[in-house]
């Protein structure tokens, strides 16, 4: 086992324990503060990742030039700032707090473990089977890894029912399996979304905060796309 993999596993376990503690014991106000801090870190990493784009944005903007807002690059690069600010500092915190406190802790943990297992499945299948690349956006992603993600995403609901965990009413049925597969799909698309911007800016990672992983965005890229989408699903009563 490589030292890099050991660091990756160790960091993941520490991060998981901290996350579980905060989810279970933080009250809503402190939880909101914590999620806001997470959002700020993600926003900063987003800006750092898009450094080349942001430099171009600066060049395209001149507050004293009347035609600054007619420059097509201004709108293109401003959208990078705007998306990051709105998504990480508004949409994400609202979604997380709603799912944790207005839906339930158990459901939030269910989502979290679907994403974790999906990520693990992608790594296990991709590393051991390999095969044809999934897309040029992320050369390390393989089709076998994607299949592994889908397969592993069903494990949480199977484990819940095998252990007959009390107070968790998530049955092993077609709808819940389909939901787990959908969450895995969104996780993978979220990963590819951020990989696209990293590749666009010749970046391997979004940061150096987490040993073995890179930045915080590298670790939770799928989850932070999943949560707002599930928030909308719950708001509209789809699931």
For the regions a language model picked out, list residue spans one by one.
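Hydrophobic alpha-helical transmembrane segments of integral membrane proteins
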Residues: 89-90, 207, 224-225
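Juxtamembrane boundary at the C-terminal end of a transmembrane helix
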Residues: 232-239
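Interfacial loop-to-transmembrane junctions
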Residues: 199-222
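Short glycine/threonine-rich catalytic loop with a Thr-x-Gly-x-Asp
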Residues: 144, 188, 216-220
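Membrane-embedded alpha-helical bundles of polytopic integral membrane proteins
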Residues: 1-181, 185
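Juxtamembrane interface at the ends
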Residues: 122, 128, 195-203
């Amino acid at each position: 086992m490589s030292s890099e993999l050991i660091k990756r596993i160790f960091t993941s376990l520490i991060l998981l324990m901290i996350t579980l503690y905060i989810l279970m014991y933080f009250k809503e106000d402190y939880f909101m503060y914590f999620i806001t801090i997470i959002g700020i870190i993600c926003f900063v990493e987003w800006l750092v990742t898009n450094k080349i784009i942001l430099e171009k944005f600066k060049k395209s903007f001149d507050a004293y030039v009347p035609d600054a807002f007619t420059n097509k690059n201004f709108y293109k690069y401003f959208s990078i700032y705007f998306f990051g600010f709105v998504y990480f500092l508004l949409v994400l915190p609202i979604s997380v707090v709603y799912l944790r406190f207005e839906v339930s802790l158990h459901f939030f943990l269910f989502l979290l473990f679907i994403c974790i297992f999906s990520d693990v499945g992608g790594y296990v299948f991709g590393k051991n089977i390999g095969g044809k690349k999934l897309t040029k956006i992320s050369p390390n992603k393989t089709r076998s890894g994607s299949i592994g993600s889908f397969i592993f995403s069903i494990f949480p609901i199977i484990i819940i029912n095998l252990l007959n965990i009390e107070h968790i009413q998530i049955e092993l049925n077609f709808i819940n399996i389909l939901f787990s597969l959908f969450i895995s799909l969104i996780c993978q698309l979220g990963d590819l979304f951020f990989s696209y911007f990293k590749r666009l800016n010749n970046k391997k990672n979004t940061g150096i905060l987490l040993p073995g992983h890179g930045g915080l965005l590298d670790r939770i890229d799928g989850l932070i796309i999943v949560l707002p989408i599930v928030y909308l699903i719950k708001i509209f009563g789809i699931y």
